[in-house]
Structures are given as structure tokens and as C-alpha cells.
Amino acid sequence: VPEELTEADFYSRASVQAAYKQGLVPLGLDMETVETVTWKPCGGNLLYLTEKESQMAAFARLLSRGKQKTIILAPQYNEIESDENVLVVNNPDEYEELIAVISQKIDERMKAKNFDHVATLVLYNLTELIEKMSQETRDNLAYILDKGERGGYASIVMTVPSLNRQIDPVSAVAKSFKKAIMAVRITDQTVVAVNNKPLREQLLEEQIHYYVQNTIANKIKVLMY
């Protein structure tokens, strides 16, 4: 794995380009095998735990290069760079309406047994995002996170490790996600269960995250600083 992973190096890799073509999201390079670690939108929702908003913004940039439709719901003030490939909704009135529409669509699609992937919904900085949401919108959003993937809407939730202290319905569903990337040490969070935690966990070096799937964590090198 290169000492520093640059955008030019990462995006020029054949495996990364192939992942994007297949509708996958390349997350980074496995530190042991150097293979590209990817996320499949219809293979289980994804949680991103980080203390830094700059890393959330970098992850949003990574998502914007994908082929699939991506909708980002974000607090009014955020660090996301605008990109024509991605719809960013940061006006509370607009996202309340959008959440209601999507939850209804999921309902209709599931009744019609239409399970094809439509779009990936990204909740940017969740803890701040839901602060001003009405209870009805929170309930709809929790429904989207819980059932959306079957109805064609996969979810990525970006949030801080203090998610474990949140008791709202949206956070409760996000905490149950089986896949996660973490910019923090396993020891420094209690949201994601990890069974192969190292005895003496070192500080994470720059550009190193954990990718957790089915309670097993592997280190990956990422573009998020």
C-alpha cells in the first residue's frame, strides 16, 4: 500500500474504475491484500463514524464519482463541495418533503415487489441533521433506513461516535447497521461491535480507517484525511 494514497493513484487503479462501473462504491485499499474494498448499495447499509467533518466531506466527494444516483441530506451549513452528479438537500422544508416522498415510494415498491436499486440516500452529519426534524420526519427517516434497501433505497449514515448516546428512532436504526467504516479507534467508540479488537490498539495513522463487516474489522487506506 502506498505511503500516501493520492486521488490520482486511487482513481487510476483498474479495480477502482471497475468498481464504479459495476455501481459499487470503492472505500479504500485493504492494508494487507492491497485489494480495493468496496460497498455494494444493495448489500446492506453503511455507517461512517468520524470526529471530523472534513472526512465526511471527503467521503461525500468519493460518492459523487459513482454511477448510481446519490441524494445527500445535510445540515444547512456543511463542507460538501457541489457536484452535478449528486443532489444535496440542505433546506429543512425540502428534505422533510423529500423524506415523506421517499418513504411512500419505498412502501409502494415493496407492495409491488419491486426491489431494484433506485438511489443511495446519504445522511450527512446525522446528529446535527436530525436536531431540527419533526417527529413525523424522524419516524419516516427511520423507516427509510430500516426498510429502504429492500425498496430500492440504500442508506449511508455519516455521524460522530457520540451516536451511542442518541435515543431517537433514526439513530437507533443507524446503530444496528452491520457494515461500518471508522476513522476512530475501536476503543474510542461503542457504536460498532468488533470481535477481533487488538489487545493494544495503536493510534490510527493518517488515512487509515477500519472497515467492519459482520463484527470483523480490517484496516484500509482511504482518501479521507
Regions found by a protein language model. Give the residues of each.
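P-loop NTPase catalytic phosphate-binding loop
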Residues: S15-I181, R185, Q202, L223
